[in-house]
Amino acid sequence: MRDTDRPGGGGLPRRTLLLTGLAGAVAAGISLPSAAPASAATRTAGTNGWPFTSTGISTLPVPGTPASVALLEGDVSTVLLHVVRRFHYEVEEVARHELAGHRPAAGLTGHTTNYASGTAVEIRPAAYPLGATGVLFPPQLAVVRDILKECGGVVAWGGHLRRPHAAHFQIAVRPGDPRLRGLAQRIKGWTQAPGQGAGVLTLGA
């Protein structure tokens, strides 16, 4: 692959996606698929423990972008919208129809079952399809790692799966985990304070 190749156009060149394998997946809080993963037809909750629902789901605009996405309202949407905003500003711009969120559970397996609870989002899924490698340039990957670090284990990334899914971000804690509320409150504070939050340039950083 040439250095001049671009992932989905308009972004930094493609490079080999650096994966951390099994250890990275465990650290990120994503359950790796078993030999015979249960389908959504035999379960009532996603792999992250959140129940399937069509209640409390809203299609929400992502501030600073032309895009919107269907997510579970409340702390979940606050956190995932923040992730999308940082991705848009720091990794790759997100166009109007380049997000996918809540969807019916039928046919979903493994980590994708979390879409049915509104607790996961795909960012530019056509550019970063399931199983694809070489879709992020190292500086972009560094930003993704920084986003995960900022979220303190509350958010997991599909790039750490054995079969990578770089478009996928999900809530990685169970319902009621206080870390989710704490992170959501911090994000709300950042968005209300001048000079903080996604998209803010920090000089000298």
Model-found features: residue ranges?
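N-terminal secretory signal peptides
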Residues: 1-12
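N-terminal export leaders
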Residues: 13-28
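C-terminal segment of N-terminal export signals and the immediately downstream linker at the start
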Residues: 32-51, 55, 204-205
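Active-site acidic/histidine clusters and adjacent loop/turn architecture
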Residues: 44-89
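Second-shell loop/turn segments in exported
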Residues: 64-71, 127-135
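Surface-exposed patches in mature extracellular/periplasmic domains of secreted proteins
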Residues: 90-99, 154-161
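Mid-length scaffold segments of soluble, non-membrane domains
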Residues: 91, 104-132
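Catalytic cores and adjacent binding grooves of peptidoglycan-active enzymes
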Residues: 115-118, 130-205
